[in-house]
A protein has these predicted regions:
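Asp-based, Mg2+/Mn2+-dependent phosphohydrolase catalytic module
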Residues: 1, 89, 93-96, 101-105, ...
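N-terminal helical cap/lid subdomain that shapes the substrate entry/recognition surface
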Residues: 1-90
Length: 219
């Protein structure tokens, strides 16, 4: 069986990482504490292109670095804001013990994705990684799901676990996967058909998936 995971705010806590980075920057530059929330908002959950994000951050009151200095400092400091993801390690270890294949599909960059997985302690637990920039198509395109299944050496059948309604849940469902949505304090908004299950954590999602699989196998 195949379990496909999103990366940011699914396997790794990106929201906390960008807030940690904002705190580091504000402390370094002596900026107002209010700038932390502003920086997190400018990031838009990672949707803001990095050059745009850093240009707007540079315009905030109290910034002393030049744009180039800020870019270089971001490149050297951001990934250090990610830590070991104990809960995700437990979830993936449980799946592997049950002989599931584990794939990761992300629209992020290849270099940063690999480094995030390493920082989180997840790299040894993953069978295949598909990054949109490397594969040539982003989620929710079915082809990136086909590719992660191919790299795992299994048919495209199983589950997609993620936090993004369109890219993860909509894309996974269109690819024929069952879907698990990580709520992150939100309610389902009906933008695409609802997920098969909702959960508050990766560990909860995996436990529910394994219970569902066990029930199917005992029928």
């Amino acid at each position: 069986m195949l379990a496909v995971f999103d990366l940011d705010d699914t396997l790794v806590d990106r929201s906390s990482a960008i807030r940690r980075w904002a705190q580091l920057l504000v402390g370094r530059e002596g900026m107002s504490a209010d700038a932390i929330g502003a920086i997190v908002g400018i990031d838009r959950d990672g949707a803001a292109p990095r050059d745009e994000f850093l240009a707007v951050v540079h315009s905030l009151p109290g910034m002393r670095m030049t744009v180039t200095e800020l870019r270089n400092w971001y490149a050297g400091s951001y990934l250090s804001c990610y830590g070991v993801e104990d809960e995700s390690i437990r979830a993936l270890t449980t799946l592997r013990a049950a002989r599931w294949k584990i794939g990761v599909v992300t629209n992020g960059s290849q270099e940063r994705t690999t480094e995030k997985l390493t920082h989180a302690g997840l790299a040894p637990l993953i069978d295949a990684l598909c990054v949109a920039a490397e594969v040539g198509v982003p989620k929710p395109d079915r082809r990136i799901f086909d590719e992660v299944a191919r790299r795992c050496g299994v048919e495209l059948s199983g589950w997609m676990i993620g936090d993004a309604p369109v890219e993860d849940i909509g894309g996974g469902a269109q690819a024929g996967l069952r879907t698990a949505w990580l709520r992150r304090g939100r309610r389902w908004d009906g933008e695409v058909p609802p997920p098969d299950i909702e959960a508050d954590s990766v560990l909860e999602a995996v436990a529910t998936i394994l219970n569902a699989d066990q029930r199917i196998n005992t029928w």
